[in-house]
């Protein structure tokens, strides 16, 4: 199959310089064992912007006769970090911190990861950026993902998932969600983020409560929406909420004359 995903992430709606993210990814299998992918990413917050693109390669190994497989992946990416201070208004003119109006830096980086999976379970770990960079504070992040899908009835399945993120000098945080999947077409459920030090979401760790919902519009097209509301005090009248929209195209191949079922992960 070939899959194309388009994502838009918006935070602090109606605030100038609010965080925004756009992402595009394309992946396909060249054979039963080899897959390749391409992704592009644009992230902006205030005067800072990060634009990157990457090429991914994956090799899949079949571990047993029960469809347990291991995917090993490598990533090569180019990242342009930009800082434009020309629109910043300061209290005092001539502030030395703002003498350099623009700053740009291009970095080449590499990533690696693995993905262990079967039709009902997955476990993965990845490091998107192996090389750290000081000027724009690019740190090495470790990601761990774990999830599965459980059949409750012919029309209902539950899909719990966990994402753990570890960065040096920052609290280890995790995102947790559980979806209800109805008729292999609709899904919805709660999600939240917290840190290992704070079991419940807290503003300090960027915690939030949220919800996610989606639908397969057709066998090849799905649409998802996620809402996140941060915890803690709201300051300066800013509504610290996040909206995320995902559009996914799946061009499914035929195997022995039978169309494969929609992918849930």
Where are these regions (language model features)?
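Subset of outer-membrane beta-barrel
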Residues: 1-265
């Amino acid at each position: 199959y070939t899959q194309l995903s388009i994502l838009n992430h918006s935070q602090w709606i109606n605030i100038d310089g609010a965080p925004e993210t756009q992402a595009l990814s394309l992946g396909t299998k060249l054979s039963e064992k080899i897959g390749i992918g391409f992704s592009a990413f644009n992230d902006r917050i205030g005067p800072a912007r990060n634009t990157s693109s990457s090429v991914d390669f994956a090799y899949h190994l079949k571990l047993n006769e029960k469809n347990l497989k291991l995917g090993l992946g490598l990533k090569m990416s180019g990242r342009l970090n930009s800082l434009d201070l020309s629109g910043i208004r300061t209290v005092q003119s001539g502030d030395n911190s703002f003498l350099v109006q623009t700053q740009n830096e291009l970095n080449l980086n590499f990533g690696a990861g693995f993905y262990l999976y079967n039709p009902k379970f997955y476990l993965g770990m990845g490091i998107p950026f192996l090389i750290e960079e000081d000027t724009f504070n690019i740190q090495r992040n470790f990601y761990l993902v774990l999830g599965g899908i459980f059949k409750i009835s012919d029309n209902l399945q539950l899909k719990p998932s966990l994402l753990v993120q570890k960065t040096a000098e920052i609290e280890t945080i995790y995102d947790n969600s559980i979806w209800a999947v109805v008729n292999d077409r609709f899904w919805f459920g709660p999600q939240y983020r917290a840190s290992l030090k704070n079991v419940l979401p807290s503003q300090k760790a960027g915690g939030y409560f949220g919800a996610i919902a989606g639908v397969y519009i057709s066998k090849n097209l799905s649409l998802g929406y996620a809402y996140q509301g941060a915890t803690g005090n709201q300051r300066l009248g800013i509504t610290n909420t996040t909206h995320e929209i995902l559009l996914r195209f799946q061009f499914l191949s035929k195997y022995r004359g039978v169309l494969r079922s929609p992918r849930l992960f």
